[in-house]
Amino acid sequence: MHNHIIMKPSIRVAFILTGIFSHFLLFAQQKQKAKDEKPKTKTENPDMNTVRMKSISPLDTLAIERIVGMKGKFNNGEYKITVPQNDLSIEVDGFKIIPAMGLSTWIDFAPAPDGAMIMGDLVLTENDLKPVQQAVIQQGLTITAIHNHFVRNHPDVMYMHIGGWGSTETVATKAKAVLDKIKETRGNDPSKGNTSSESINNSLNTQALDKLLQYKGEMTKGVYKYTIGRPDVQLREHGIPVTSFMGFNTWAAFQGTPDHAAVAGDFTMTEDEVAPVIKTLIENGIEVVALHNHMVHEQPRIFFLHYWGVGNAEELAKGLRAALNQTGKKNSMQGMGMSGKDHQ
C-alpha cells in the first residue's frame, strides 16, 4: 500500500511559485555573471569613437565653391575659404596692417561623419559684431571665441571664431549667410576693397631672421611670415583632427626695416606652456596683447596668445626664438611643419 501525501491547495501553489522563483533567480545570476565576464571597451572620448565608427567621405569642394560663391584652397583633404579684408585701413604704432599681417577672414571645411565640420575666424569691426553674431546663431552655428589681435589699432577690429557641423551643402549655406551678413553691414565686399590691398615696404634681412628663428618664412606684399605647426600635439575637436591648415599653429609676421621693424603673431600653447611663453616674450620686450581659446571642445586643452613687438628686427627674432624654446619640449622642435600660407 502506498502512502500518498495530500497537499492543501494553498501549499501546492506556494510550492510551485517557489520553484519558479528559484529558476528565475538562477537565470538572472547566470546572465549577470556572463555580463560581468564580457570584455569592457574603453571609451575615453565618445566623439572620437563615433568618428571611428562612421565612414568619412571626401569633401565636395565644387559644391562648397558653388554655394559660397568663391574659390578656396585645398590641402590634405581640407578646404579653406579666405576673404582678405582689403576694405579696412588699420595702423598700429605707425605700421600698416594688411591681410598678410593677420587681417583675413577664413572658414575651413574638414571632412566629418555625414558631411563636414567647419571652423572659422571672422574679422569684424565694432559695427559688424552684433549683427554678425546674431546671424551666426540664427544659422545654428556656434561662437567659440571673441577677442582682439592688436591694441592701439585704429579702427578697432575684433576676431570671432565660429564652428559648425552638418552636411557639406548645409554648412556651406550657413557659411555663405554669415559672410553675406558681413558684406551687408560693411556696405561692400571686403575682398574687393583697395584700402589695404597694396604692398608695403620691407627691407628686412630675411636670411638673418631665418637663421635666428631656424625656419624659413614667405614674403607676401612686403610681409615676411613664418607659420609653425605643432605635430607634437595630436589635437582634436569633436574627435576630428585639427591641423595647422585649420589654424592650429604659431605664426610671426614681420615688416619694416632692420632697425625699425614690427612683428605680430600668435602662439599656440598647451596649458603648461602658457606661463613660460608669456614670461619669455615680456622679458624680451615683446608685448602680449591677448590670451584666449579658439575652440571649446578640443582635446588636449590649447591656448592662443597674440603678441606685438616693435624694434630691431634681429632682437625681435631672438626674443621669439627664446619663446619658441618654451614650447614642444617633450619633442624636438626640429621638423615642425611650416608653411607661410597655412594661416591667411
Question: What label would you give each PLM region?
Answer:
Residues K31-D156, G163-I302, W308-Q344:
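Long, contiguous binding/interaction regions
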Residues A14-H23:
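Bacterial N-terminal signal peptides
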Residues I6, H23-L25:
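C-terminal multi-pass transmembrane helix bundles with aromatic-rich, positive-inside signatures
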Residues L26-Q30:
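Boundary at the C-terminal end of the N-terminal hydrophobic targeting segment
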Residues M7, G19, K42-E44:
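N-terminal compositionally biased, intrinsically disordered segments and leader/signal-like regions
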